[in-house]
Amino acid sequence: MIHFVKNIPIDENVPENYKEIVFGAGCFWGVERKFWDLPGVFLTSVGYSGGDIENPSYEDVCYRDTNHAEVVKVTYDSNVINLMDLLKIFWECHDPTQGMRQGNDIGTQYRSVIYTNNDDDLKVALKSKDIYQKELVKNNFKTDSLESITTEIEPVKNYYLAEEYHQQYLAKNPNGYCGIGGTGCSFPKL
């Protein structure tokens, strides 16, 4: 499988000093588009993560109770772009207070998630959540409670590559559906 935007194999061997992070923020088509062209991002792919069965299909994730989220795996050079920069894009591209949905896309597969590969990245992700929660409160974002961000943040449990037609979908289909939308609150400069 070839990455439609980067023109390299999606299963390309990751350079040793590169890092990976997994984001879920609604339909993976729009989320992937936010990351694939960023300087320092080596590769993106969409898949399913956090669920209870191995090698799920799109139909399994949508129509069965697999507990997977639609996600984007971002492989990046941390010497060019740091994790906090990626997290800024993640927080701003969707509404992390909506629980098991993003806009009109409803279901557990559309939940907000961050899955990390190590404890240091987990700490940074948790810190970024606290920063963004304070920003939502500061901007009087309409939420149910002061602890309104519902994003699941934990070590990556599994990652299964989605079908080829989902990979870089919005590059192949520029007028395709994208239901993600942010809160309008910017992640503060640190």
Map each language-model feature to its residues.
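Flexible coil/turn and secondary-structure edge motifs
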Residues: 1-190
